[in-house]
Amino acid sequence: MASQMNPELPSPTGNGRSSAASWEQFEQSKMLELIRSLPEPKAYHHEELSAIRRQAAELRTRISQYQHALQRPIQHENKHYHITALGGAICRLKIILWRMFPFNNLPVEIVVNIFRFAVWSTINSPEGILLRFHLTWVCRRWRHIAIHDQTLWNTIWFKDVKLGYQRSKLYFERAGTATLDLRIEDDDNSRLIPGQPMTADDMTRILDILMIKSNQIRMLIVVVELWPPLLVLLDRLHRSSRTLHQLERIEIHRTGRPYRWDGPDYPLCDYEHALSLCNGQTQRINYICLNGIHLDWNRSCLTNLTNLDLRRMPPDLGPSLDRFRYMLESSPNLRKLSLDGAGPIVPMDSYARPYPPVFLPRLESLALGDFLVTYAIFYAGIIHAPNIREITLLNLVGEDHAQLFKVMTGKFPELLMLTLFSVKIRKGLENGRIMVPWLLSIPKIKFIRMAGMEPDMLDLFYVDGRFHIRNDIPLNLATEMKQAILANGSPITICPELEAIEVQQIDINSVVRFVSDRKRLEVPLRNLYIHLNSFNAMTPDETAILQTQKYEPNFVYVTVPMRLTPIEESIWKQVRGG
Protein backbone atom coordinates (compact mmCIF):
# COMPACT_ATOMS: atom_id res chain seq x y z
CA MET A 1 0.00 0.00 0.00
CA ALA A 2 1.20 3.52 -0.76
CA SER A 3 -0.38 6.74 0.43
CA GLN A 4 -0.04 10.17 -1.09
CA MET A 5 2.08 12.62 0.84
CA ASN A 6 0.62 15.55 2.78
CA PRO A 7 -3.05 14.57 2.62
CA GLU A 8 -5.26 17.58 3.32
CA LEU A 9 -8.13 15.55 4.73
CA PRO A 10 -9.52 12.05 4.28
CA SER A 11 -11.42 12.38 1.03
CA PRO A 12 -12.65 10.20 -1.84
CA THR A 13 -13.06 13.16 -4.19
CA GLY A 14 -10.32 12.18 -6.61
CA ASN A 15 -8.79 15.65 -6.40
CA GLY A 16 -5.28 14.20 -6.24
CA ARG A 17 -4.54 15.31 -2.70
CA SER A 18 -6.31 12.62 -0.71
CA SER A 19 -4.60 9.85 1.17
CA ALA A 20 -5.78 6.30 0.55
CA ALA A 21 -4.65 5.21 4.00
CA SER A 22 -6.28 8.21 5.74
CA TRP A 23 -9.54 7.76 3.84
CA GLU A 24 -9.72 4.09 4.82
CA GLN A 25 -9.22 5.01 8.48
CA PHE A 26 -11.85 7.75 8.29
CA GLU A 27 -14.30 5.49 6.46
CA GLN A 28 -13.87 2.61 8.89
CA SER A 29 -14.29 4.86 11.93
CA LYS A 30 -17.34 6.64 10.50
CA MET A 31 -19.07 3.46 9.36
CA LEU A 32 -18.53 1.71 12.68
CA GLU A 33 -20.00 4.76 14.41
CA LEU A 34 -23.07 4.69 12.14
CA ILE A 35 -23.58 0.92 12.38
CA ARG A 36 -23.46 1.02 16.18
CA SER A 37 -26.16 3.70 16.19
CA LEU A 38 -28.56 1.59 14.10
CA PRO A 39 -30.98 -1.06 15.38
CA GLU A 40 -30.45 -4.78 14.69
CA PRO A 41 -30.97 -5.57 10.97
CA LYS A 42 -34.30 -7.14 9.97
CA ALA A 43 -36.33 -7.94 6.87
CA TYR A 44 -37.98 -4.75 5.60
CA HIS A 45 -41.63 -4.37 4.56
CA HIS A 46 -42.49 -2.78 1.22
CA GLU A 47 -43.24 0.61 2.79
CA GLU A 48 -39.95 0.58 4.72
CA LEU A 49 -38.00 -0.28 1.57
CA SER A 50 -39.64 2.59 -0.31
CA ALA A 51 -38.68 5.03 2.45
CA ILE A 52 -35.09 3.75 2.49
CA ARG A 53 -34.83 4.07 -1.30
CA ARG A 54 -35.98 7.71 -1.03
CA GLN A 55 -33.33 8.29 1.63
CA ALA A 56 -30.68 6.76 -0.66
CA ALA A 57 -31.76 9.02 -3.52
CA GLU A 58 -31.49 12.07 -1.25
CA LEU A 59 -27.98 11.04 -0.19
CA ARG A 60 -26.90 10.63 -3.83
CA THR A 61 -28.14 14.15 -4.56
CA ARG A 62 -26.30 15.53 -1.54
CA ILE A 63 -23.08 13.72 -2.53
CA SER A 64 -23.28 15.23 -6.00
CA GLN A 65 -23.75 18.71 -4.52
CA TYR A 66 -20.71 18.31 -2.24
CA GLN A 67 -18.57 17.10 -5.14
CA HIS A 68 -19.58 20.05 -7.33
CA ALA A 69 -18.88 22.45 -4.47
CA LEU A 70 -15.37 21.05 -4.02
CA GLN A 71 -14.61 21.65 -7.69
CA ARG A 72 -15.13 25.40 -7.21
CA PRO A 73 -12.65 27.74 -5.45
CA ILE A 74 -13.74 27.93 -1.82
CA GLN A 75 -12.21 29.00 1.47
CA HIS A 76 -10.21 26.43 3.44
CA GLU A 77 -12.77 26.29 6.28
CA ASN A 78 -15.64 25.58 3.88
CA LYS A 79 -13.56 23.03 2.02
CA HIS A 80 -12.90 21.18 5.27
CA TYR A 81 -16.64 21.12 5.98
CA HIS A 82 -17.56 19.88 2.49
CA ILE A 83 -14.93 17.11 2.51
CA THR A 84 -16.03 15.84 5.92
CA ALA A 85 -19.71 16.05 4.97
CA LEU A 86 -19.05 14.26 1.69
CA GLY A 87 -17.22 11.45 3.46
CA GLY A 88 -20.05 11.05 5.96
CA ALA A 89 -22.70 11.00 3.21
CA ILE A 90 -20.83 8.32 1.27
CA CYS A 91 -20.55 6.16 4.39
CA ARG A 92 -24.27 6.52 5.15
CA LEU A 93 -25.19 5.64 1.56
CA LYS A 94 -23.04 2.52 1.66
CA ILE A 95 -24.67 1.30 4.86
CA ILE A 96 -28.18 1.94 3.51
CA LEU A 97 -27.44 -0.01 0.32
CA TRP A 98 -25.92 -2.86 2.29
CA ARG A 99 -28.95 -3.12 4.59
CA MET A 100 -31.33 -3.10 1.63
CA PHE A 101 -29.53 -5.86 -0.23
CA PRO A 102 -31.34 -9.25 0.10
CA PHE A 103 -28.16 -11.16 0.95
CA ASN A 104 -29.88 -14.23 2.39
CA ASN A 105 -31.75 -14.75 -0.88
CA LEU A 106 -28.47 -15.52 -2.65
CA PRO A 107 -27.68 -19.16 -3.53
CA VAL A 108 -25.41 -20.93 -1.04
CA GLU A 109 -22.55 -21.30 -3.53
CA ILE A 110 -22.44 -17.51 -4.06
CA VAL A 111 -22.54 -16.85 -0.31
CA VAL A 112 -19.64 -19.30 0.13
CA ASN A 113 -17.56 -17.44 -2.45
CA ILE A 114 -18.31 -14.11 -0.76
CA PHE A 115 -17.28 -15.53 2.63
CA ARG A 116 -14.02 -16.85 1.19
CA PHE A 117 -13.27 -13.57 -0.54
CA ALA A 118 -13.89 -11.64 2.69
CA VAL A 119 -11.68 -13.95 4.76
CA TRP A 120 -8.82 -14.08 2.27
CA SER A 121 -8.86 -10.33 1.61
CA THR A 122 -7.98 -9.29 5.14
CA ILE A 123 -4.87 -7.17 5.65
CA ASN A 124 -3.21 -9.53 8.13
CA SER A 125 -3.49 -13.14 9.26
CA PRO A 126 -4.87 -12.51 12.80
CA GLU A 127 -7.73 -10.50 11.32
CA GLY A 128 -8.58 -13.33 8.90
CA ILE A 129 -8.52 -15.87 11.72
CA LEU A 130 -11.03 -13.94 13.82
CA LEU A 131 -13.22 -13.04 10.84
CA ARG A 132 -14.01 -16.72 10.27
CA PHE A 133 -15.37 -16.91 13.80
CA HIS A 134 -17.33 -13.69 13.32
CA LEU A 135 -19.10 -15.16 10.28
CA THR A 136 -20.50 -17.94 12.46
CA TRP A 137 -21.92 -15.47 14.99
CA VAL A 138 -24.22 -13.48 12.66
CA CYS A 139 -27.17 -15.84 12.25
CA ARG A 140 -28.04 -19.54 12.01
CA ARG A 141 -27.90 -19.58 8.20
CA TRP A 142 -24.46 -17.97 8.04
CA ARG A 143 -23.20 -20.27 10.78
CA HIS A 144 -24.43 -23.36 8.92
CA ILE A 145 -22.90 -22.24 5.61
CA ALA A 146 -19.57 -21.25 7.16
CA ILE A 147 -19.11 -24.34 9.30
CA HIS A 148 -19.87 -26.71 6.43
CA ASP A 149 -17.43 -25.03 4.02
CA GLN A 150 -14.23 -26.97 4.72
CA THR A 151 -12.12 -24.68 2.53
CA LEU A 152 -12.96 -21.74 4.78
CA TRP A 153 -11.11 -23.41 7.68
CA ASN A 154 -8.16 -25.08 5.95
CA THR A 155 -5.69 -22.25 6.65
CA ILE A 156 -4.67 -22.75 10.29
CA TRP A 157 -2.23 -20.67 12.34
CA PHE A 158 -0.97 -22.56 15.39
CA LYS A 159 -0.21 -19.54 17.53
CA ASP A 160 -2.87 -19.88 20.23
CA VAL A 161 -0.78 -21.63 22.89
CA LYS A 162 -2.47 -19.48 25.56
CA LEU A 163 -5.76 -21.15 24.57
CA GLY A 164 -4.21 -24.61 24.62
CA TYR A 165 -4.44 -24.59 20.80
CA GLN A 166 -8.22 -25.09 21.16
CA ARG A 167 -8.99 -22.62 18.38
CA SER A 168 -6.53 -24.30 16.01
CA LYS A 169 -7.94 -27.73 16.87
CA LEU A 170 -11.45 -26.47 16.06
CA TYR A 171 -10.29 -25.16 12.68
CA PHE A 172 -8.47 -28.45 12.10
CA GLU A 173 -11.70 -30.35 12.75
CA ARG A 174 -13.86 -28.08 10.57
CA ALA A 175 -11.37 -28.35 7.68
CA GLY A 176 -12.50 -31.96 7.30
CA THR A 177 -10.85 -33.59 4.30
CA ALA A 178 -9.71 -30.33 2.64
CA THR A 179 -6.04 -29.76 1.86
CA LEU A 180 -4.34 -27.94 4.73
CA ASP A 181 -2.18 -24.81 4.80
CA LEU A 182 -0.53 -24.76 8.22
CA ARG A 183 1.62 -22.27 10.10
CA ILE A 184 3.33 -22.93 13.43
CA GLU A 185 4.76 -19.78 14.99
CA ASP A 186 6.49 -19.04 18.26
CA ASP A 187 7.13 -15.46 19.33
CA ASP A 188 7.31 -13.65 22.63
CA ASN A 189 3.85 -12.08 22.30
CA SER A 190 2.09 -15.44 22.03
CA ARG A 191 4.07 -17.44 24.61
CA LEU A 192 2.59 -18.62 27.88
CA ILE A 193 5.68 -17.31 29.64
CA PRO A 194 7.43 -14.38 27.93
CA GLY A 195 11.08 -15.12 27.25
CA GLN A 196 10.54 -18.89 27.26
CA PRO A 197 10.72 -20.15 23.65
CA MET A 198 8.97 -23.23 22.30
CA THR A 199 10.55 -26.50 23.42
CA ALA A 200 10.90 -29.87 21.74
CA ASP A 201 7.97 -31.18 23.81
CA ASP A 202 5.80 -28.26 22.69
CA MET A 203 6.53 -29.08 19.05
CA THR A 204 5.79 -32.75 19.67
CA ARG A 205 2.33 -31.89 21.03
CA ILE A 206 1.50 -29.80 17.95
CA LEU A 207 2.78 -32.43 15.52
CA ASP A 208 0.74 -35.12 17.28
CA ILE A 209 -2.31 -33.13 16.18
CA LEU A 210 -1.13 -32.33 12.66
CA MET A 211 0.13 -35.72 11.60
CA ILE A 212 -3.35 -37.20 12.01
CA LYS A 213 -4.02 -35.56 8.64
CA SER A 214 -0.48 -35.63 7.23
CA ASN A 215 -1.78 -36.78 3.85
CA GLN A 216 -3.78 -33.51 3.54
CA ILE A 217 -0.98 -31.03 4.27
CA ARG A 218 -0.28 -28.82 1.25
CA MET A 219 1.72 -26.03 2.91
CA LEU A 220 3.73 -25.99 6.13
CA ILE A 221 5.38 -22.85 7.53
CA VAL A 222 7.26 -23.11 10.83
CA VAL A 223 8.81 -20.16 12.69
CA VAL A 224 10.60 -20.96 15.97
CA GLU A 225 13.63 -19.64 17.82
CA LEU A 226 15.66 -22.63 18.97
CA TRP A 227 17.06 -25.84 17.49
CA PRO A 228 15.24 -28.49 19.60
CA PRO A 229 11.72 -27.95 18.20
CA LEU A 230 13.13 -27.86 14.66
CA LEU A 231 15.03 -31.09 15.17
CA VAL A 232 11.79 -32.68 16.34
CA LEU A 233 10.04 -31.29 13.26
CA LEU A 234 12.68 -32.60 10.83
CA ASP A 235 12.64 -35.99 12.51
CA ARG A 236 8.84 -36.17 12.34
CA LEU A 237 8.80 -35.14 8.68
CA HIS A 238 11.43 -37.80 8.06
CA ARG A 239 9.32 -40.52 9.71
CA SER A 240 6.06 -39.35 8.11
CA SER A 241 7.46 -38.87 4.61
CA ARG A 242 5.38 -41.65 3.03
CA THR A 243 2.11 -39.93 3.95
CA LEU A 244 3.02 -36.36 2.94
CA HIS A 245 1.57 -36.91 -0.52
CA GLN A 246 0.24 -33.37 -1.04
CA LEU A 247 3.02 -31.29 0.52
CA GLU A 248 3.95 -28.60 -2.03
CA ARG A 249 5.36 -25.74 0.02
CA ILE A 250 7.56 -25.83 3.10
CA GLU A 251 9.17 -22.96 4.99
CA ILE A 252 11.32 -23.53 8.07
CA HIS A 253 12.57 -20.44 9.91
CA ARG A 254 14.84 -20.60 12.94
CA THR A 255 15.11 -17.05 14.23
CA GLY A 256 17.60 -17.59 17.06
CA ARG A 257 21.34 -18.02 17.28
CA PRO A 258 23.78 -19.78 17.13
CA TYR A 259 23.80 -21.13 13.61
CA ARG A 260 25.06 -24.52 14.84
CA TRP A 261 23.54 -26.43 17.73
CA ASP A 262 25.84 -26.92 20.74
CA GLY A 263 25.77 -26.96 24.51
CA PRO A 264 23.73 -28.98 27.01
CA ASP A 265 20.38 -27.78 25.67
CA TYR A 266 20.99 -29.31 22.24
CA PRO A 267 20.68 -33.15 22.27
CA LEU A 268 23.38 -34.09 19.76
CA CYS A 269 23.25 -37.68 21.00
CA ASP A 270 19.95 -37.99 19.14
CA TYR A 271 20.85 -35.82 16.14
CA GLU A 272 24.50 -36.37 15.29
CA HIS A 273 24.07 -35.56 11.61
CA ALA A 274 22.00 -33.11 9.59
CA LEU A 275 18.70 -34.65 8.56
CA SER A 276 17.30 -34.91 5.08
CA LEU A 277 14.03 -33.20 4.24
CA CYS A 278 11.14 -35.68 4.41
CA ASN A 279 13.55 -38.60 3.92
CA GLY A 280 14.10 -37.47 0.35
CA GLN A 281 10.42 -38.07 -0.51
CA THR A 282 9.73 -34.55 -1.68
CA GLN A 283 8.72 -34.99 -5.30
CA ARG A 284 5.68 -32.66 -5.02
CA ILE A 285 7.42 -29.90 -3.08
CA ASN A 286 8.04 -26.94 -5.38
CA TYR A 287 8.48 -24.10 -2.87
CA ILE A 288 11.28 -24.30 -0.29
CA CYS A 289 12.49 -21.71 2.20
CA LEU A 290 15.16 -22.66 4.76
CA ASN A 291 16.17 -19.92 7.18
CA GLY A 292 18.85 -20.57 9.79
CA ILE A 293 18.84 -24.33 9.26
CA HIS A 294 20.68 -26.71 6.96
CA LEU A 295 20.01 -30.21 5.69
CA ASP A 296 21.71 -33.33 4.51
CA TRP A 297 21.65 -31.91 1.00
CA ASN A 298 22.72 -35.06 -0.80
CA ARG A 299 19.87 -37.10 0.71
CA SER A 300 17.25 -34.39 0.21
CA CYS A 301 15.43 -34.52 -3.12
CA LEU A 302 15.12 -30.83 -4.03
CA THR A 303 14.02 -30.82 -7.66
CA ASN A 304 11.22 -29.37 -9.81
CA LEU A 305 11.22 -26.22 -7.69
CA THR A 306 9.51 -22.94 -8.54
CA ASN A 307 10.90 -21.07 -5.49
CA LEU A 308 14.22 -21.68 -3.74
CA ASP A 309 14.96 -19.43 -0.76
CA LEU A 310 18.04 -20.08 1.42
CA ARG A 311 18.92 -17.78 4.33
CA ARG A 312 21.44 -17.50 7.18
CA MET A 313 23.66 -20.56 6.85
CA PRO A 314 27.39 -20.84 7.62
CA PRO A 315 29.38 -20.95 4.37
CA ASP A 316 30.52 -24.53 4.99
CA LEU A 317 27.02 -25.92 5.67
CA GLY A 318 25.36 -25.05 2.38
CA PRO A 319 25.00 -27.55 -0.45
CA SER A 320 28.06 -28.40 -2.48
CA LEU A 321 28.31 -26.54 -5.76
CA ASP A 322 27.67 -29.73 -7.71
CA ARG A 323 24.56 -30.47 -5.63
CA PHE A 324 23.32 -26.89 -5.98
CA ARG A 325 23.81 -26.97 -9.74
CA TYR A 326 21.88 -30.24 -9.83
CA MET A 327 19.03 -28.61 -7.89
CA LEU A 328 18.90 -25.77 -10.43
CA GLU A 329 19.27 -28.00 -13.49
CA SER A 330 16.45 -30.18 -12.17
CA SER A 331 14.17 -27.15 -11.74
CA PRO A 332 13.56 -25.74 -15.24
CA ASN A 333 10.43 -23.92 -13.97
CA LEU A 334 12.26 -22.08 -11.18
CA ARG A 335 10.78 -18.58 -10.91
CA LYS A 336 12.40 -17.16 -7.79
CA LEU A 337 15.90 -17.71 -6.40
CA SER A 338 16.90 -16.01 -3.16
CA LEU A 339 20.28 -16.45 -1.45
CA ASP A 340 20.42 -14.31 1.69
CA GLY A 341 23.45 -15.08 3.83
CA ALA A 342 23.40 -18.60 2.40
CA GLY A 343 24.30 -20.46 -0.74
CA PRO A 344 26.37 -23.26 -2.21
CA ILE A 345 29.90 -23.86 -0.97
CA VAL A 346 32.29 -21.98 -3.23
CA PRO A 347 35.16 -24.34 -4.22
CA MET A 348 38.72 -23.22 -3.61
CA ASP A 349 39.46 -23.49 -7.33
CA SER A 350 36.30 -21.65 -8.40
CA TYR A 351 38.19 -18.95 -10.30
CA ALA A 352 40.64 -21.30 -11.99
CA ARG A 353 38.04 -23.89 -13.00
CA PRO A 354 35.26 -22.65 -15.30
CA TYR A 355 31.68 -23.59 -14.44
CA PRO A 356 29.20 -23.30 -17.31
CA PRO A 357 26.13 -21.33 -16.16
CA VAL A 358 22.88 -23.19 -15.53
CA PHE A 359 20.13 -22.11 -17.93
CA LEU A 360 17.00 -20.98 -16.05
CA PRO A 361 14.58 -19.79 -18.75
CA ARG A 362 11.66 -19.02 -16.41
CA LEU A 363 13.53 -17.35 -13.56
CA GLU A 364 11.81 -14.01 -12.83
CA SER A 365 13.28 -12.91 -9.52
CA LEU A 366 16.82 -13.07 -8.11
CA ALA A 367 17.91 -11.88 -4.64
CA LEU A 368 21.50 -11.89 -3.35
CA GLY A 369 22.51 -10.50 0.03
CA ASP A 370 24.30 -10.62 3.36
CA PHE A 371 27.56 -12.19 2.21
CA LEU A 372 30.85 -11.15 0.64
CA VAL A 373 30.50 -9.41 -2.70
CA THR A 374 32.89 -12.02 -4.11
CA TYR A 375 30.25 -14.67 -3.32
CA ALA A 376 27.60 -12.60 -5.09
CA ILE A 377 29.86 -12.31 -8.13
CA PHE A 378 30.33 -16.08 -8.19
CA TYR A 379 26.62 -16.86 -7.71
CA ALA A 380 25.57 -14.39 -10.41
CA GLY A 381 28.02 -16.05 -12.77
CA ILE A 382 26.73 -19.61 -12.40
CA ILE A 383 23.24 -18.89 -13.76
CA HIS A 384 22.01 -17.86 -17.18
CA ALA A 385 18.56 -16.31 -16.74
CA PRO A 386 17.87 -13.83 -19.54
CA ASN A 387 14.19 -13.41 -18.58
CA ILE A 388 14.70 -12.11 -15.04
CA ARG A 389 12.33 -9.23 -14.26
CA GLU A 390 13.44 -8.39 -10.72
CA ILE A 391 16.82 -8.27 -8.96
CA THR A 392 17.50 -7.47 -5.29
CA LEU A 393 21.00 -6.80 -3.94
CA LEU A 394 21.30 -6.08 -0.24
CA ASN A 395 23.92 -5.69 2.48
CA LEU A 396 26.84 -7.13 0.53
CA VAL A 397 30.18 -7.07 2.36
CA GLY A 398 32.99 -5.16 0.67
CA GLU A 399 34.14 -1.60 0.04
CA ASP A 400 33.32 -1.56 -3.68
CA HIS A 401 30.65 -3.62 -5.45
CA ALA A 402 31.28 -2.42 -9.00
CA GLN A 403 32.76 -5.74 -10.16
CA LEU A 404 29.43 -7.45 -9.46
CA PHE A 405 27.71 -5.14 -11.93
CA LYS A 406 30.45 -5.84 -14.46
CA VAL A 407 29.63 -9.56 -14.24
CA MET A 408 25.91 -8.84 -14.62
CA THR A 409 26.24 -6.49 -17.60
CA GLY A 410 24.35 -7.89 -20.57
CA LYS A 411 22.90 -10.85 -18.62
CA PHE A 412 19.47 -9.42 -17.79
CA PRO A 413 18.05 -7.49 -20.77
CA GLU A 414 14.42 -7.99 -19.61
CA LEU A 415 14.97 -6.52 -16.13
CA LEU A 416 12.07 -4.30 -15.01
CA MET A 417 12.61 -3.82 -11.25
CA LEU A 418 15.82 -3.30 -9.28
CA THR A 419 16.29 -3.05 -5.51
CA LEU A 420 19.63 -1.89 -4.07
CA PHE A 421 20.25 -1.84 -0.31
CA SER A 422 23.57 -0.46 0.94
CA VAL A 423 25.30 -1.05 -2.39
CA LYS A 424 28.71 0.64 -2.49
CA ILE A 425 30.17 2.01 -5.71
CA ARG A 426 33.45 3.85 -5.27
CA LYS A 427 33.34 7.09 -7.19
CA GLY A 428 35.74 7.30 -10.12
CA LEU A 429 36.07 7.13 -13.88
CA GLU A 430 36.85 3.40 -13.89
CA ASN A 431 33.69 2.51 -11.99
CA GLY A 432 31.71 4.87 -14.19
CA ARG A 433 32.86 2.81 -17.17
CA ILE A 434 31.47 -0.28 -15.37
CA MET A 435 28.21 1.14 -14.09
CA VAL A 436 27.02 3.08 -17.14
CA PRO A 437 27.28 0.04 -19.49
CA TRP A 438 25.40 -1.96 -16.83
CA LEU A 439 22.58 0.58 -16.84
CA LEU A 440 22.62 0.67 -20.64
CA SER A 441 22.22 -3.12 -20.62
CA ILE A 442 18.88 -2.88 -18.75
CA PRO A 443 16.99 -0.47 -21.04
CA LYS A 444 13.54 -1.74 -20.00
CA ILE A 445 13.92 -0.99 -16.28
CA LYS A 446 10.78 0.72 -14.91
CA PHE A 447 11.29 0.85 -11.15
CA ILE A 448 14.33 1.21 -8.89
CA ARG A 449 14.35 1.05 -5.09
CA MET A 450 17.44 2.41 -3.31
CA ALA A 451 18.18 2.48 0.42
CA GLY A 452 21.17 3.47 2.51
CA MET A 453 23.29 4.55 -0.45
CA GLU A 454 25.44 7.49 -1.40
CA PRO A 455 23.77 9.83 -3.92
CA ASP A 456 26.60 9.15 -6.42
CA MET A 457 24.50 6.32 -7.84
CA LEU A 458 21.87 8.81 -8.98
CA ASP A 459 24.53 10.86 -10.78
CA LEU A 460 25.09 7.97 -13.20
CA PHE A 461 21.68 8.60 -14.75
CA TYR A 462 22.74 12.03 -16.05
CA VAL A 463 25.58 10.61 -18.15
CA ASP A 464 25.30 10.59 -21.93
CA GLY A 465 25.56 6.93 -22.91
CA ARG A 466 27.47 7.81 -26.08
CA PHE A 467 30.65 8.19 -24.00
CA HIS A 468 30.41 4.59 -22.69
CA ILE A 469 29.00 2.47 -25.51
CA ARG A 470 32.50 1.21 -26.39
CA ASN A 471 35.33 0.23 -24.06
CA ASP A 472 37.91 1.75 -26.40
CA ILE A 473 36.60 5.27 -25.74
CA PRO A 474 39.15 6.89 -23.40
CA LEU A 475 38.01 7.79 -19.90
CA ASN A 476 39.79 11.14 -20.12
CA LEU A 477 38.67 12.53 -23.45
CA ALA A 478 40.50 15.15 -25.42
CA THR A 479 38.34 18.12 -26.37
CA GLU A 480 38.36 17.19 -30.05
CA MET A 481 37.18 13.62 -29.41
CA LYS A 482 34.49 14.80 -27.01
CA GLN A 483 33.16 17.24 -29.59
CA ALA A 484 33.24 14.53 -32.26
CA ILE A 485 31.14 12.21 -30.07
CA LEU A 486 28.67 14.99 -29.27
CA ALA A 487 28.31 15.77 -32.96
CA ASN A 488 27.56 12.13 -33.78
CA GLY A 489 23.85 11.43 -33.29
CA SER A 490 21.48 12.16 -30.42
CA PRO A 491 22.28 11.69 -26.71
CA ILE A 492 21.77 8.18 -25.32
CA THR A 493 19.59 8.45 -22.22
CA ILE A 494 20.22 6.05 -19.35
CA CYS A 495 17.17 3.87 -18.57
CA PRO A 496 14.69 5.79 -20.76
CA GLU A 497 11.69 3.75 -19.57
CA LEU A 498 12.26 4.36 -15.85
CA GLU A 499 8.90 5.39 -14.36
CA ALA A 500 9.46 5.54 -10.61
CA ILE A 501 11.97 5.25 -7.81
CA GLU A 502 11.61 4.52 -4.10
CA VAL A 503 14.16 6.04 -1.75
CA GLN A 504 15.11 5.35 1.84
CA GLN A 505 17.95 6.99 3.77
CA ILE A 506 19.17 8.95 0.74
CA ASP A 507 19.93 12.68 0.70
CA ILE A 508 16.68 14.43 -0.20
CA ASN A 509 18.44 17.18 -2.18
CA SER A 510 19.93 14.54 -4.48
CA VAL A 511 16.51 12.95 -4.91
CA VAL A 512 14.91 16.28 -5.82
CA ARG A 513 17.70 16.96 -8.28
CA PHE A 514 17.26 13.51 -9.82
CA VAL A 515 13.55 14.13 -10.36
CA SER A 516 14.13 17.51 -11.98
CA ASP A 517 16.98 16.26 -14.17
CA ARG A 518 14.92 13.34 -15.48
CA LYS A 519 12.30 15.88 -16.47
CA ARG A 520 14.96 18.05 -18.11
CA LEU A 521 16.15 15.01 -20.10
CA GLU A 522 12.54 14.57 -21.31
CA VAL A 523 12.14 11.23 -19.52
CA PRO A 524 10.18 12.38 -16.44
CA LEU A 525 9.25 10.06 -13.60
CA ARG A 526 5.62 9.22 -13.01
CA ASN A 527 6.06 8.72 -9.26
CA LEU A 528 8.46 9.27 -6.41
CA TYR A 529 8.01 6.83 -3.52
CA ILE A 530 9.43 7.60 -0.09
CA HIS A 531 9.65 4.77 2.42
CA LEU A 532 7.57 5.40 5.53
CA ASN A 533 10.57 5.10 7.88
CA SER A 534 12.47 7.72 5.90
CA PHE A 535 9.43 9.96 5.69
CA ASN A 536 8.93 9.85 9.46
CA ALA A 537 12.64 10.58 10.01
CA MET A 538 12.70 13.64 7.74
CA THR A 539 13.62 16.93 9.36
CA PRO A 540 11.34 19.97 8.93
CA ASP A 541 13.88 21.40 6.48
CA GLU A 542 13.81 18.23 4.37
CA THR A 543 10.02 18.19 4.36
CA ALA A 544 10.01 21.83 3.29
CA ILE A 545 12.34 21.01 0.40
CA LEU A 546 9.82 18.51 -0.94
CA GLN A 547 6.84 20.79 -0.40
CA THR A 548 8.44 23.66 -2.30
CA GLN A 549 8.88 21.55 -5.44
CA LYS A 550 5.20 21.91 -6.39
CA TYR A 551 5.02 18.45 -7.86
CA GLU A 552 1.96 17.29 -9.76
CA PRO A 553 -0.88 15.75 -7.72
CA ASN A 554 -0.36 12.05 -6.98
CA PHE A 555 3.37 12.27 -7.75
CA VAL A 556 4.85 11.71 -4.27
CA TYR A 557 3.75 8.66 -2.30
CA VAL A 558 4.72 7.32 1.11
CA THR A 559 5.17 3.55 1.00
CA VAL A 560 4.36 1.13 3.80
CA PRO A 561 7.05 -1.42 4.79
CA MET A 562 6.74 -4.97 3.44
CA ARG A 563 4.28 -3.99 0.72
CA LEU A 564 4.68 -3.73 -3.02
CA THR A 565 4.34 -0.27 -4.48
CA PRO A 566 1.47 0.28 -6.94
CA ILE A 567 3.89 0.31 -9.87
CA GLU A 568 5.39 -3.05 -8.80
CA GLU A 569 1.92 -4.54 -8.60
CA SER A 570 1.16 -3.17 -12.06
CA ILE A 571 4.41 -4.52 -13.54
CA TRP A 572 3.89 -8.02 -12.14
CA LYS A 573 0.32 -7.99 -13.42
CA GLN A 574 1.57 -7.15 -16.92
CA VAL A 575 4.36 -9.75 -16.75
CA ARG A 576 1.87 -12.47 -15.87
CA GLY A 577 -0.70 -11.35 -18.40
CA GLY A 578 -3.21 -10.13 -15.84
Language-model segments: what does each one mean?
Residues 2-578:
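Leucine-rich repeat
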